[in-house]
C-alpha cells in the first residue's frame, strides 16, 4: 500500500490550527499534535468564559450598587425592592454606572427607594 502524503487539504487544516496557536509557549505553538490539543482546550475556555463574563460583570455591578446604597443608608436588597415598588426600571449596569460617576443622581434614586419602602 502506498504512503499517503499530506495533501493540500491536510496542509490547510494544519496551517489553520498552527495559526490559531500563534503565541503559545513551547511546543504548543510549533508542533501540530500538541498545538491542536491546546487550541481545542483554548476554544473550550473561550466558550465557557464568554458565559462566565456575564456573571462576573453582574457580580461587579451588584458590589458597586451595594457599596453606594450603604453610603445612602440602605442595603442592596432594600434599595432594589424600593426601586421596584417605585416603578423605576433601571438595570444594574446603569445603577452601577450612576453609583460610580453620578453619586447625586444615585442618592436621589436611593431617597426614592426609601420613600417607597416606608409606605
From Swiss-Prot:
| GO MF | rRNA binding; structural constituent of ribosome
Name of the molecule in the record: Large ribosomal subunit protein bL20
> Cross-referenced PANTHER family, in alphabetical order?
39S RIBOSOMAL PROTEIN L20
Instruction: Give the classification, highest ranks.
Output: Bacteria, Bacillati, Bacillota, Bacilli, Bacillales
Q: Which Gene Ontology cellular component terms are annotated?
A: ribonucleoprotein complex; ribosome
Describe its function: Binds directly to 23S ribosomal RNA and is necessary for the in vitro assembly process of the 50S ribosomal subunit. It is not involved in the protein synthesizing functions of that subunit.
Recorded superkingdom: Bacteria
Checking Pfam families in the record gives:
Ribosomal_L20 (PF00453)
What's the family? Belongs to the bacterial ribosomal protein bL20 family.
Against InterPro entries, the record matches this protein to: Ribosomal_bL20 (IPR005813), RIBOSOMAL_L20_CS (IPR049946), Ribosomal_protein_bL20_C (IPR035566)
Q: Which gene encodes it?
A: rplT
